[in-house]
Amino acid sequence: METNNHFFYVVKCKDNSWYAGYTNDLHKRVKTHNDGKGAKYTKVRRPVELIFAESFSTKREAMQAEYYFKKLTRKKKELYIEEKRNSKEAVYVKAPNEL
């Protein structure tokens, strides 16, 4: 991944809950979560699996997407991901039956 990109991402935890965050390096961030060095929330819910990532040109835009997403209900989060599936910003989306 290019280091000048900014990503809003969602990982699925072992207990099927979701964690949303911001990063400028997707691979490294998911690895950090799985190494138990990421967020406290994911530390006790490992392993995590990337289910969605969206690219933005600025950190601010990516963090705004994260903030918006975190306010949604689970059902609306699923709809958000499905609606973004074919957008040019979506860089990774799991199949609907795998969410």
UniProtKB/Swiss-Prot annotation:
Domain of life from the UniProt record: Bacteria
InterPro entries named among the record's database cross-references: GIY-YIG_endonuc, GIY-YIG_endonuc_sf, UPF0213_domain
Every GIY-YIG domain range: 4-79
SMART domains registered for this protein in UniProt: GIYc
Disulfide bridge map: none
Protein family per UniProt: Belongs to the UPF0213 family.
Entry-linked PANTHER family: UPF0213 PROTEIN YHBQ
Protein name from the UniProt record: UPF0213 protein YazA
